Amino acid sequence: ISTPLMVVTDGGSGFRKAMKDTWPQVRIQRCLFHVYLNITALTSKRPRLAPGRELKWLAHQLLAAKTPKDAWQWEQDYLAWEARWAGFLAEKSVYATGEYKDTHAKLVRARNLVRTLLRQGQLFTFLSPALLAASGLETLPSTNNRLEGGINAQIRRMWGWHRGMPFLHRVKAAY
């Protein structure tokens, strides 16, 4: 397989290791839909607290980012959210064991997820002018849903139809 310009991934750790071993210099674009799902899983679908509602809204806005200006605006909105709720996210609770832990642990995890992706430059790789020019395409993908909903879905559907098939037969049927 020739080296790609960019890889879109859902963020699985196995893929990250394979990328590091195989194509260490290739740019990574985290699937924005999967980032949205990750944040929604941590904030819940109907957050009760204002910081959770705002972060969920920001996650939804992430899917609408199509231009460098949109990406810049999203990042500014996120940084404003983080500054606005810094004190809230820093709150700690003392447990019976004497341990101090984050009071709003899931929101802190969601914040850390976004921080990491921004620091690593994996949220808006698909908008990189250099990659667009090198690819010769008008746009680069921001999600891997075309792959998951197209090619992989057909394989999963076939496996569903033949549930009793032994593992090796399923592997052979997929190829």
Mark where each language-model region is:
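Acidic/histidine-rich catalytic cores and adjacent linkers
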Residues: 13-16, 23, 53, 57-175
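Conserved beta-strand -> loop -> alpha-helix junction used to position metal-binding or nucleic-acid-contacting
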Residues: 6-13, 18-60
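Electropositive, glycine- and tryptophan-enriched low-complexity nucleic-acid-binding patches
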Residues: 1-4
